[in-house]
Amino acid sequence: MNTKTLLALFTVICAASIIAQTSNYTAVEAAKHIGEMATVTDRVDGVHQSGKGNIFLNMGGKYPNQMFTAFIPTASAGQFRNFQQYEGRTVTVSGKIALYRGKPEIVVTAPSQLTIK
């Protein structure tokens, strides 16, 4: 194998290792991990679409007492036409945990970030 092939293989293995090591947290635990790339798994207690088209999947309680939100911006909402299906279901949300108005959230821009357990 030449050097370029070995380097490419090494890069792929490292990337796969990092992805496999993504931490998994509950809605309550997410607040302790702001800034991390992670997966949050919990029950969706409330679903709402704003007048502007943003979708909110609230976990760990209903709004405004939720512990975590999976936020789907208007620009991505068209990919989640049946978003009501998540209410009452346990889901996993993957992405970077951020803090918005004192609550942890992950911005979801692709269906691959959100799965029903």
Model-derived features with residue positions:
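N-terminal secretory signal peptides that target proteins for export/translocation
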Residues: 1-2
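OB-fold and OB-like single-stranded nucleic-acid-recognition modules
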Residues: 18-117
